[in-house]
């Protein structure tokens, strides 16, 4: 009985010591009161949900004979770390057809301060045969703050594709920006229904001079080059279309 009493007394003493230590534990940092205020400091709100959208290219293109319309935009909703992206781009040609219509739905995860990894689906939806792809890629700011993105794609029957894009904003003044832009597409197999050949299929590049009326809206002018190569060029020639063109462009860029 004496041993049981001693054990009980020891347990009670340990519980008392633990309770006292808990009562004297330091206040968590996010509950500390700044000197001279009556409000607690709030933790960093890195889990707030934001919405962002940008129409990077909304432009007419012309070589003096055949005007085309080009769009390229994207938007996302999410936190600093996790986002859902929608991207869309394409051409409406002077004959009323739509081509190069690519629409992507991606989950985005930040992996470093400047780069995100993205995965999801791409749908080629325009006047030609519809194709659907699985997508995996990256997007971010490279050294010297070039905006770059590269994506690999895969679909049925062993078809693979890749796309790389890069652009940069040179601030000539606070409101006048010169933007070079480059995009290249590659495919592992030919797809005649979409006038796509294996290898490097097309390059779209341009130089645009933008005047920002404010940071969210700016009209621009410039020059753009579209080129089809290799087997893609052969397929395009068969239907009587041009394999390359240099065009004057004019449009607007806006974001929210």
What are these regions (language model features)?
Residues 23-95, 101, 108-109, 248:
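Outer-membrane beta-barrel initiation region
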Residues 49-51, 67-71, 99-103, 130-134, ...:
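Residues that define the transmembrane beta-barrel architecture of outer-membrane proteins
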Residues 57, 86-90, 119-123, 150-154, ...:
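Transmembrane beta-barrel strands of outer-membrane/channel proteins
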Residues 73, 105, 136, 164-166, ...:
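Membrane-embedded beta-strands of outer-membrane beta-barrel proteins
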Residues 77-79, 109, 140, 154, ...:
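Residue-level signature of outer-membrane beta-barrel architecture
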Residues 81-86, 113-117, 144-148, 173-178, ...:
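Repeated loop/turn-to-beta-strand initiation elements of outer-membrane beta-barrel proteins
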Residues 130-192:
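Detector for outer-membrane/organellar transmembrane beta-barrel domains
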Residues 207-212, 242-256:
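Outer-membrane beta-barrel "beta-signal"
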